[in-house]
């Protein structure tokens, strides 16, 4: 079997101008980055912004194994299959972060015969969005430090600066640094640190902004530090929101590429779902909804993280609500949740599938709490057996959730036809009745408690001393009505990554909060979630290379 990159490089790409004609995008609507990549102009976005939106399908998953369960692959294959059965479909995905590409993933543009192309470009620098976000973030850091160096007219307490620098790499050595060393000419020494670019609030802002003016307003509302009197300092106090918006003026425009089967794909923005809200940009999803009859999009990691945030944070910013949610499950992940060691996941174990089904069942129940119908997609792997598949289908039947096998990795659009037909049946039955888990009027404690008890299956929430003090402070500043973005391990419903399946009776501990007032939510930090990942012992980068003619090698 060919590798992902070998498959991608064997495909004869169509010019992007030709690919997007089918959804009503013309040559003058594009800002081209070569033959196969483009940004969509604001003229076109504004032209369609009042059009009636089409149907929205959200793809999510059970709690994953470290390798992931193939949400992007299923999303792409489903979109291709929907087009094949005659539904005008677009896909809206996140763009990959170079850190995980070089680290554990080795690429994140789908897999097999369900990929977005050109995958090498998408996985590396693409159209420069990550660079622009990194630059805007670090320009803010530089301007903040310069303000302090030039007299600190705002009275910023250097011990209480919460804004960090970023880089789009996994680099644990940069988590904690000291800046301003070298004497008076080089600034004032203080502790600082780096996050990965996709954890930057500017990434979240870019993905939630609806236009340039909204982007500028959100940037102005970023809290960067506190004064000596403990009042917050915003970007607007530094008067630099205009400069930051200027840096991002092209990055805010959605990127257009294609799948192997020629489905138009909007790939834009890429916040992580364990430390941010985990969804691609509102602009990309909203525009796809107005250009196509069906839009397929995804939310990062399992439904306890990405889907909850999509439904509670992103959906209120969209022109419509999801008509169906597809939960991706793999037999290997179910067996892992059923107690099987990672080394034994390729061996048949029907009982482990039954035991691990509790994880999938809870995710199904959770999505139904939002009033949205669910379809389960079994992402097929070579090691799957007929007995295991039959057991999973039987268990899904018992909780009355439709389930389809999807072999899009191996068979492309043809491997997703059954899933596409089932999704269309569910969508056209019109049973979706979306409702948020919590209201804006709920306190932060109430919102978190609802997420922990209703979605995670936990017993209660424990707030450490720092978090308790922040709750009081945030209420004084009027931030307590913002949505909550939980920063939690993706591997478990709990904050303990080793507690698999569907645990109950556990507590979730909130150690501190991070205000993301520009993005419009409050991040609650649990466990030991890192905002700057490290590299594994054998990074994917070790297998990467480029040939003399410029062909990429080793992107999975």
UniProtKB/Swiss-Prot annotation:
InterPro entries: Formate_THF_ligase (IPR000559), Formate_THF_ligase_CS (IPR020628), P-loop_NTPase (IPR027417). It is an enzyme of class 6 (ligase). GO terms for biological process: tetrahydrofolate interconversion. It catalyses: (6S)-5,6,7,8-tetrahydrofolate + formate + ATP = (6R)-10-formyltetrahydrofolate + ADP + phosphate. The keyword Amino-acid biosynthesis does not apply. Its EC number is 6.3.4.3. Pathway: One-carbon metabolism; tetrahydrofolate interconversion. CDD domains: FTHFS. The keyword Disulfide bond does not apply. One of its GO terms (molecular function) is ATP binding. ATP binds at residues 65-72. Keywords: ATP-binding, Ligase, Nucleotide-binding, One-carbon metabolism. It comes from the Bacteria. Pfam families: FTHFS. Belongs to the formate--tetrahydrofolate ligase family. This is Formate--tetrahydrofolate ligase. It comes from Streptococcus thermophilus (strain ATCC BAA-250 / LMG 18311).
């Amino acid at each position: 079997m060919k590798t992902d990159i070998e498959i991608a490089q064997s495909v004869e790409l169509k010019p992007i101008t030709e690919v997007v004609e089918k959804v009503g995008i013309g040559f003058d609507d594009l800002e081209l980055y070569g033959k196969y990549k483009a940004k969509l102009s604001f003229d076109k976005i504004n032209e369609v912004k009042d059009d009636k939106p089409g149907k929205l399908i959200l793809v999510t998953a059970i709690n994953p194994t470290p390798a992931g369960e193939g949400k992007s692959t299923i999303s792409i294959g489903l979109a291709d299959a929907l087009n094949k059965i005659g539904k005008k479909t677009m896909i809206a995905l996140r763009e990959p972060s170079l850190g995980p590409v070089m680290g554990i993933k080795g690429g994140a543009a789908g897999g097999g015969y369900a990929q977005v192309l050109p995958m090498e470009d998408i996985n590396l620098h693409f159209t420069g969005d990550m660079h622009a976000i990194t630059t805007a973030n670090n320009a803010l850091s530089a301007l903040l430090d310069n303000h302090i160096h030039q007299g600190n007219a705002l009275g910023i307490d250097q011990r209480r600066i919460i804004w960090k620098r970023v880089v789009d790499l996994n680099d644990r050595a940069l988590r904690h640094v000291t800046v301003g060393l070298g004497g008076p000419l080089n600034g004032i020494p203080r502790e600082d640190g780096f996050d990965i670019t996709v954890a930057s609030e500017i990434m979240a802002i870019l993905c939630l902004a609806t236009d340039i003016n909204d982007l500028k307003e959100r940037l102005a509302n970023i809290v960067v530090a506190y004064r000596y009197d403990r009042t917050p300092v915003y970007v607007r106090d530094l008067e630099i929101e205009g400069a930051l918006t200027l840096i991002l003026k092209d990055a805010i425009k959605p990127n257009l590429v294609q799948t192997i089967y020629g489905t138009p794909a909007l790939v834009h923005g890429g916040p992580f779902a364990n430390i941010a809200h985990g969804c691609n940009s509102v602009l990309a999803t909203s525009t796809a909804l107005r250009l196509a009859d069906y839009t397929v999009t995804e939310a990062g990691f399992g439904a306890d993280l990405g889907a909850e945030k999509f439904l509670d944070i992103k959906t209120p910013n969209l022109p419509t609500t999801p008509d169906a949610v597809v939960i991706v499950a793999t037999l290997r992940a179910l067996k892992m949740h059923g107690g099987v060691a990672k080394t034994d996941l390729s061996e048949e174990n029907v009982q482990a599938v039954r035991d691990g089904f509790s994880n999938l069942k809870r995710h199904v129940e959770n999505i139904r709490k939002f009033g949205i119908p669910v379809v389960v997609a079994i992402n097929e792997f070579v090691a799957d057996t007929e007995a295991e598949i039959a057991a999973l289908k039987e268990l899904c039947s018992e909780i009355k959730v439709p389930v389809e096998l999807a072999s899009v990795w191996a068979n492309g659009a043809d491997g997703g036809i059954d899933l596409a037909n089932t999704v269309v049946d569910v969508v056209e039955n019109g049973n979706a009745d979306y409702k948020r888990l919590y209201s804006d009027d709920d306190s932060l404690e109430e919102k978190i408690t609802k997420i922990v008890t209703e979605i995670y299956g936990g017993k209660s929430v424990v707030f450490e001393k720092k978090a308790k003090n922040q709750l009081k402070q945030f209420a004084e500043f009027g931030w307590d009505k913002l949505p909550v973005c939980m920063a939690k391990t993706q591997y478990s419903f709990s904050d303990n990554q080793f507690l698999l399946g569907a645990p109950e009776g556990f507590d979730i501990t909130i150690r501190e909060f991070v205000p993301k007032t520009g993005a419009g939510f409050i991040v609650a930090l649990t466990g030991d979630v890192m905002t700057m990942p490290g590299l594994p012992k054998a990074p994917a980068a070790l297998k990467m290379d480029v040939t003399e003619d410029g062909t990429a090698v080793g992107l999975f």
